[in-house]
C-alpha cells in the first residue's frame, strides 16, 4: 500500500485498524495497543523502535534455539534461557500467540525431550512467521506517521 498518498489522520486510523485486526486474529493482545500508546510519553520513535528491536531479537533467539537443538547433546539450560528471553519479549510487546508457544517449549525443556522441543520450536517459528509480516507492515505505517510528524516540527 502506498502510504504517501494518504493524509496523516487516515494513516493513524489505518494503524489503529491494523492493530485491531491483529487483536481479532489473536496474534497480539491489548498490551500491543498499550505499547503503541506509550509513544505519547516516550517519544514518537518508541513504537517503531520497539517493533524493530522485538523482531530482530526474536529472530536471533529463534536461530540460537535452532542451533542448540541441532547439537548432538542438547543444552537444556541454554534452551531454557533462550525460551525465557523470547517469552518475556513476546509478553512485553503483547505477542500472545508467540508467548503461548514459548510455554509449550518450556514444558518440553522441563521434560528434557528433544522431540517435543523440536515440535515446540517449529510452533514458535510458525508463530513468529505469522507475526512478522503484519508487524513489518505496522512498522512501515508507523514510520511514515513518525516521519510526517517529525517534518511538522
Give the residues covered by each predicted segment.
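Two-component system phosphorelay core
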Residues: 1-153
Amino acid at each position: 500500500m502506498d502510504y504517501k498518498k494518504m493524509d496523516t489522520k487516515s494513516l493513524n486510523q489505518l494503524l489503529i485498524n491494523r492493530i485491531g485486526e491483529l487483536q481479532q486474529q489473536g496474534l497480539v493482545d491489548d498490551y500491543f495497543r498499550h505499547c503503541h500508546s506509550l509513544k505519547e510519553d516516550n517519544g514518537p520513535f518508541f513504537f517503531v523502535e520497539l517493533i524493530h528491536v522485538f523482531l530482530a531479537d526474536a529472530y536471533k533467539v529463534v536461530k540460537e534455539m535452532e542451533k542448540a537443538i541441532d547439537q548432538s547433546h542438547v543444552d537444556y539450560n541454554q534452551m531454557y534461557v533462550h525460551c525465557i528471553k523470547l517469552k518475556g519479549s513476546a509478553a512485553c510487546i503483547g505477542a500472545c500467540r508467540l508467548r503461548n508457544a514459548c510455554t509449550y517449549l518450556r514444558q518440553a525443556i522441563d521434560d528434557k525431550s528433544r522431540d517435543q522441543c523440536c515440535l515446540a520450536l517449529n510452533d514458535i517459528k510458525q508463530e513468529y512467521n505469522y507475526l512478522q509480516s503484519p508487524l513489518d507492515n505496522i512498522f512501515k505505517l508507523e514510520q511514515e506517521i513518525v516521519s510526517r510528524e517529525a517534518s511538522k516540527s
